[in-house]
Amino acid sequence: MGGLGNQLYQLAYADFLRRTYGYHCCIVNDWGIEKADTLGRDRVVRSLFTDIIKHCQFYYISPELGLQWSVYCRTKPFLRYFEEEQSKNAVYLSKNESRFSSFPPLAQKPRLFLPFVYRISGYFQSYKYTSLEFRNKIREFLEGIVSLPTTLEGIASGLTERSVAIHFRRGDFLKHPEIYKIFGAEHYLRGLNLLAGNKDIDKVYVFSDDFDAIESDLEIISQQYNLVRVEGGTVYEDLYLFSRFKRYVLAGSTFSWWGAFCSQYSDDIEVVVPRYPLKRSTSEDTFFPPHWIQLEEIDKISN
């Protein structure tokens, strides 16, 4: 299921199925992961944010629900199972006349199956599932639940339309180099210089899950820009604060992408991202909307 960013993509896909086809979607906690400690500040934890599921008005089934879980487990062998291909988690499943056209490939079809009930698994990291209505709903949720501590409220009150948010993801990215790219100071400077060419930058606000790991990158960037570290917030506080910006330079973190998706400025924002954020990215990917600025890698430009 992943962290909050991945969970929001999965909810956006469920919302897409509900809006487009009228499906009644239920979020199933097959992973058995614990409900999130929304006051926690540990970025390593990958918990389930059930309060957002409830806010989006989806049904939810988990092992602790007893009878409902028992019914699901008995029914599960008789459900057709559709599973997203590992290399296609950002490829939009276009809709057409068939009610299965927006489903990933069929992975299991029991000889006896229940009609009109399906099990679907995947990440669905395409901007095309993220409707404006859904993004507004997530922002409204954050605005209703978050009360910033004094230090972060001071940061929020100092933001202007010239401010820029940047986000460094390290943590589990460093543990899985076969999947994730690590973007350093060079990527962020390219993005910042691009934004500065359009409008001056007053301050650059830095978000990260591991500031110790990016000290050398920040030292390089600070030679050109005035940096402000955003530290000490919960996951919700960081995402809420991230949504208060109008300008962003981002890398491979879905958490940061959702901060931009939920910006209070809606689509009237400037966002710089890498064209290929993952090592297994493809030309078919639809991570980012077309108005976001996508940077090619330096070696591809030189070639």
Residue ranges and their predicted role:
Residues L4, N193-S281, F287:
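Donor-binding and catalytic core of enzymes assembling or modifying cell-surface/extracellular glycoconjugates
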Residues Q10-L17:
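Short amphipathic alpha-helix
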Residues P277-N303:
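Leloir-type glycosyltransferase catalytic cores
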Residues G2-G3, W31, F124, R170-D172, ...:
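Short, flexible loop/turn elements at secondary-structure junctions
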Residues M1-Y9:
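A short, glycine/small-residue-rich beta-strand->loop->alpha-helix junction that serves as a flexible
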Residues K35-H55, A213-Q224, T282-P289:
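Short, aromatic/basic amphipathic alpha-helical patches
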Residues T38-D200:
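Secretory-pathway luminal glycosyltransferase catalytic domains
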Residues Y23-E34:
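A short beta-strand-loop structural module common to alpha/beta enzyme folds
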